[in-house]
A protein has these predicted regions:
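Structural detector for internal amphipathic alpha-helices that build alpha-solenoid repeat scaffolds
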Residues: 34-46, 66-83, 107-111, 115-130, ...
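Short coil/turn segments at helix-helix junctions and helix-capping linkers
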Residues: 144-145, 221-222
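Bacterial N-terminal signal peptides
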Residues: 9-17
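Bacterial N-terminal signal peptides that target proteins for export
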Residues: 1-8
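Amphipathic alpha-helical scaffolding segments comprising HEAT/armadillo-like alpha-solenoid repeats
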Residues: 25-30, 34-62, 81-107, 130-142, ...
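Sec/Tat signal peptide C-region and signal peptidase I cleavage site
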Residues: 18-22
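Mature soluble domains of exported/periplasmic/lumenal proteins and thiol-rich metal-chelating peptides
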Residues: 178-184, 196, 250
Length: 250
């Protein structure tokens, strides 16, 4: 109840802030229409971001799936409008491991296991595109076992595109081998192939990448389109590597 009241009050503050700041800007224009107006816009944006960050933090901390879903909606809107902050980063990192890093039990049953929340948080971390987002996604892949969540994390890592010292490749390759043995999942295998294709230029350990792609191609637990895609990726990577070698020899 306390969380709901606080969220409502914060939301009211967020909605009324533009009107308050607009009045302040009108007064400022009378003194200096240029510099003061720019200053007020900066203050207004900082105020809105602060309110937004606090509100998102409270919704993430509140119990229940609905508050976390609303938090994700606020975060998505902020990212679509080009607003990023430490609060948003922290909120997404928390939501991406909801039910894993912090477990709430009632009568011995986990009541905060929300795979769909974690999956969506992973997608938005990809939209963040920061080093911290990359690190959060790698943490998800270490701790989560839900194929849908892991698939979203793999896709987001491919979109971020950071792979210093094969850090991201090694993580994805480990996931590929793990699920290939324990729980072959066609949708995950397909996303791994797509990500390998995107990242192939930055991957140093080409040998292990080829081995993983070929293992997917020869694993009949995967549907035919996925195995066909594996051969396509293999050919594409091989041709790209050959062209690169030819350029180096010229």
């Amino acid at each position: 109840m306390r969380h709901k009241l606080l969220i409502l009050s914060l939301a009211l503050g967020l909605f009324t802030a533009p009107f308050i700041c607009a009045q302040n800007k009108d007064a400022a224009k009378k003194n200096d229409k240029n510099s003061e107006s720019d200053s007020m816009i900066t203050v207004e944006q900082a105020y809105l971001n602060s309110i937004e960050g606090v509100m998102i933090k409270e919704m993430v901390a509140a119990e229940g799936r609905d508050s976390k879903r609303v938090a994700l909606q606020y975060i998505e809107e902020a990212l679509n409008q080009g607003r990023q902050s430490e609060e948003i980063q922290a909120a997404l990192s928390t939501l991406a491991t909801e039910g894993l890093s912090t477990v709430i039990r009632e009568d011995g049953r986990v009541v905060n296991n929300y795979p769909e929340i974690r999956r969506r948080a992973c997608e938005l971390l990809g939209q963040m595109g920061t080093d911290k987002a990359k690190d959060s996604l790698i943490t998800v892949m270490y701790t989560d076992n839900e194929p849908a969540v892991i698939t979203a994390a793999v896709k987001s890592l491919g979109e971020i595109g950071k792979n210093d010292n094969d850090e991201v490749f090694n993580m994805i390759n480990w996931i590929a081998r793990k699920f290939d043995t324990v729980n072959p999942t066609s949708s995950l295998a397909l996303e791994i192939l797509n990500t390998f294709e995107k990242m192939s230029g930055s991957i140093t350990n080409k040998k292990e990448m080829f081995e993983t792609v070929m293992r997917i191609a020869n694993n009949y637990n995967y549907v035919t389109p996925v195995r066909t895609r594996a051969y396509e990726v293999m050919r594409g990577i091989s041709n790209s590597s050959s062209n690169t070698d030819q350029k180096k020899n010229k």
